[in-house]
Amino acid sequence: KKIIKKARVYRALGVINETELRYKKKKKWNYNVKDQGWRYHMSDINAAIGITQLKRFTELASKRQAIAKKYDDYFKKYKNLVTVFSRDYKKEVPHIYCLIINKPINRNYLRSELLYKNIETGVHYKPGYYLDYYKSDKKFFPNCEKVQKKIITLPLHPGLTNNDIKKITKTLLNLLKK
């Protein structure tokens, strides 16, 4: 119950005191803000999309699991490619697929070459100490600094076909051979 109460406060911009009464249309406006909250309201359109996606969850989840498993199976042969999240995909549904490239290569150049071949990649995630809100000295995080220069996120979405996966893996490996 404490968690529910706290979540209700956070969803309403951190407003406390009589928050629940305001949602019951009793219009009590005696309130205070003691903590940071966010606007977690959802539009009807977002709710409709969410309901439709939930109906397809099993289908979409199994596609993501199968794609991640194919990537795992393909990349396990290569010592210079380390999968960041090898998992039991029966229990988890990955939302991203990250690789660490343990080979001297300019990751940003690699990404631009992949994009040139119509393979969009990402970098998940930028170290927190790079962000203004969490700014700190990177010398305290030497391993993070090394890994963040080698990490790349490959496409992982239910629309990928077997041919797409082959193209992604073969193109990546060909670029790494150069």
PLM feature spans:
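PLP-dependent aminotransferase class I/II
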Residues: 2-178
